Amino acid sequence: MSHNAMEHWKSKLSKTSTSTYVLLAVIAVVFLVTIRRPNGSKGKSSKKRASKKNKKGKNQFEKAPVPLTLEEQIDNVSLRYGNELEGRSKDLINRFDVEDEKDIYERNYCNEMLLKLLIELDSIDLINVDESLRRPLKEKRKGVIKEIQAMLKSLDSLK
């Protein structure tokens, strides 16, 4: 654009009233709102979509999940330790290099996950359980805790 054309537009803009700018802004907002809203929608579309999603979800999962028994909860933690972290931690212990940042990250990760499992075991409440059932559950939980603590001790020795 030449300098004269620029001056021409500047003079036109300076003569334009504020109400014109406000009117243009309102038109722009209405235009944007119209574009974003689906055709024929009066604001109820999100509710309709949500109810359709809920209907689909109800058909897929009609039954609520059954809570795990206390023994299953302990077994679950034990299996997760055995399947996910025990081998991974042992492998790390065998090849650990203090200078390797990946090994340090892996050690910290395993440490955090093992602590998470300990917290999960700690949250299993055995207080209101019948005494005949409580003893074996406590022993089982104690055994898993000792395994995890031994691994944590081994990982801590890598520092």
Swiss-Prot record:
Disulfide bonds: none annotated. Residues 73-159 form the BAG domain. SUPFAM superfamilies: BAG domain (SSF63491). InterPro entries: BAG_dom_sf, BAG_domain. Its main location: endoplasmic reticulum. Residues 36-159 are cytoplasmic. One of its GO terms (molecular function) is protein-folding chaperone binding. It is found in: Endoplasmic reticulum membrane; Nucleus membrane. Interacts with the HSP70 family members SSA1, SSA4, and SSB1. These interactions are strongly reduced by ADP and ATP. This is HSP70 co-chaperone SNL1. It comes from Saccharomyces cerevisiae (strain ATCC 204508 / S288c).
